[in-house]
């Protein structure tokens, strides 16, 4: 599992930070507002949706009630994976980055079963795991001549599968 918010309430709060609210919220919110307005909804719902400026507000007035939840908090609680990670019985690699603007709180070793491996990197943002390529001049492959190497994530996932005895094609 890569860059998945396991605690939806915490992820929603992280979207209230200045940077997330100014940069990511418009990018993510505008398309879902447009889709919501295309539904058969009342004028009051249209006015409420048009007034939204946070994803959590949208979830409170549209997403949660449309899916049978009392509020955005009820929806977030019900859709969070965190309470279930302690019950996982199959091997699972949960990869996240400390600088991911979407995740908020991530799982700790006390939150997960022994079959869950937590891998939290200092950097990587949201699914942006790269490493500095120190051998860029030695490579004959054009994509490897870049300063940054995008192979960290696939190589890490491959190594994880191999470590638990699952063959993984490179």
Region roles according to the model:
Residues 14-19, 109-111, 134-137:
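Short secondary-structure boundary/capping segments
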Residues 88, 93-96:
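Short beta-strand/loop motif that positions the catalytic acidic residue
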Residues 104-117, 121:
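Conserved loop-alpha-helix segment in the C-terminal half of the alpha/beta-hydrolase fold
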Residues 77-89:
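The feature captures the conserved acid-bearing segment of alpha/beta-hydrolase catalytic domains
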